[in-house]
């Protein structure tokens, strides 16, 4: 699906905890520019944190790309998390609550899917993962 880009995209390289905080803040700022209410600002920031944390935990480094988008007058925020890490061997399993290969609670990806309005994931084992999530302004 192709959307009109409202503003220049923001790219945040992710390889440490401080980058997670930076991506979260940039995403919150973009969502605020779009006019999201404070509850949705928190939702977008939380989703970005989860995706960035997964990059640090599993892929070591990657990137969060943030965009303000427009779909025939419907405005929103698009978050793309991409990495060249090991990939996810079983995406279906990874999308189940409680599944984790690192001993975490296993709520990250399923949580992002629930928080955002649209969610797509593609992963090539041994090559990396890309997650795209969108939140639309109500």
Tell what function each PLM region has:
Residues 1-11, 52-138:
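Conserved beta-strand-loop-beta-strand hairpin that lines the nucleotide-binding pocket
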Residues 1-46:
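Bergerat-fold GHKL ATPase/HATPase_c domain
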């Amino acid at each position: 699906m192709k959307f009109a880009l409202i503003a220049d995209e923001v790219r945040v390289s992710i390889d440490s905890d401080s980058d997670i905080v930076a991506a979260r803040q940039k995403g919150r700022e973009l969502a605020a520019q779009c006019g999201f209410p404070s509850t949705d600002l928190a939702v977008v920031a939380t989703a970005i944190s989860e995706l960035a944390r997964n990059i640090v935990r599993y892929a070591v480094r990657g990137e969060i790309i943030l965009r303000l988008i427009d779909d025939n007058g419907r405005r929103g925020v698009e978050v793309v998390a991409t990495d060249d890490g090991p990939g996810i061997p079983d995406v279906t399993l990874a999308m189940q609550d409680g599944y984790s290969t690192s001993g975490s609670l296993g709520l990250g990806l399923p949580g992002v899917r629930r928080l955002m309005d649209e969610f797509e994931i593609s992963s090539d084992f041994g090559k990396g993962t890309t997650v795209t999530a969108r939140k639309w302004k109500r």
